[in-house]
A protein has these predicted regions:
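Bacterial N-terminal signal peptides that target proteins for export
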Residues: 3-20
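Bacterial N-terminal signal peptides
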Residues: 18-29
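SH3-family beta-barrel domains
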Residues: 34-59, 73-77, 84-87, 94-99, ...
C-alpha cells in the first residue's frame, strides 16, 4: 500500500471516527428521555409529561395525522393533559376524564395547569400545610395555572391569587402515567395500571 493511499485511509478513518463520536454524543444527550416502551422520544423530553392546551378549540384525533378522524374537541384553554406518547408533530394525550387522543404539537404548551375534576371545591392554602390560612377555593370543573409541586403540595395561581393545594387533589400533578399509552385513541377512559 502506498503512503498516499495510507494517508487517504487514515484521513477517512479519522472522519468516520469523528462522525461516530458526534452520533454517540447525540444519542447520549437524549438517552434520558424515553417513551413508555423504552424508545427514545422525538423531542428528547420525558414521557409521560404534563402540558396544557393553548386554545379553547383543540381537535382530538384518532391517530397522529390530519387524515385521522376527529373524536371530539376540547374547549378549555389551559386544560392540563398528560403526554403519554409522541411523534415529531403529534402528542398522544390523556385528558382529565382519562380519554386518550392525539393532538397536534402546536396546540400544546409547556405551561402546566391543574384541573379540579371533582364536584367539591379544593382549598388553596397560604403555605404548604393544611393548617395554614385558606386564600381561595378552587371551584369544581375549573382550571388554574400550576407553578410547581413540592413535598406533596402544588403552588397554583389564578388572576392575583397564589397559594398551595394538596398534590393529589387535582388533575395535572401526578407523577405516574394516568392512561395506558398502549390504549387506542377514543377508547373508553380508564386509568393506567
Amino acid at each position: 500500500v502506498s503512503s498516499k493511499s495510507r494517508g487517504h485511509v487514515q484521513s477517512l478513518s479519522r472522519r468516520i471516527g469523528g462522525v461516530v463520536a458526534v452520533v454517540a454524543c447525540a444519542v447520549l444527550a437524549g438517552a434520558g428521555a424515553t417513551m413508555p416502551d423504552g424508545r427514545p422520544t422525538p423531542t428528547g423530553l420525558d414521557v409521560p409529561r404534563w402540558v396544557s392546551l393553548k386554545s379553547s378549540h383543540v381537535r382530538a384525533r384518532q391517530g397522529p395525522g390530519l387524515d385521522y378522524r376527529i373524536l371530539w374537541e376540547y374547549r378549555a384553554a389551559g386544560l392540563p393533559v398528560q403526554v403519554i406518547a409522541e411523534t415529531r408533530e403529534w402528542r398522544k394525550i390523556c385528558d382529565p376524564e382519562h380519554g386518550v387522543a392525539w393532538i397536534k404539537r402546536s396546540v400544546a404548551s409547556g405551561r402546566r395547569g391543574a384541573f379540579n375534576g371533582s364536584d367539591a371545591e379544593v382549598a388553596v392554602h397560604a403555605a404548604r400545610n393544611a393548617q395554614s390560612p385558606v386564600r381561595a377555593r378552587f371551584s369544581p370543573r375549573s382550571v388554574v395555572a400550576l407553578d410547581e409541586c413540592k413535598d406533596g403540595w402544588c403552588r397554583v395561581r389564578a388572576q392575583k391569587i397564589k397559594g398551595w393545594l394538596p398534590e393529589g387533589s387535582v388533575f395535572g400533578t401526578q407523577a405516574m402515567a394516568q392512561c395506558d399509552a398502549r390504549r387506542g385513541a377514543g377508547e373508553a377512559g380508564r386509568r393506567a395500571g
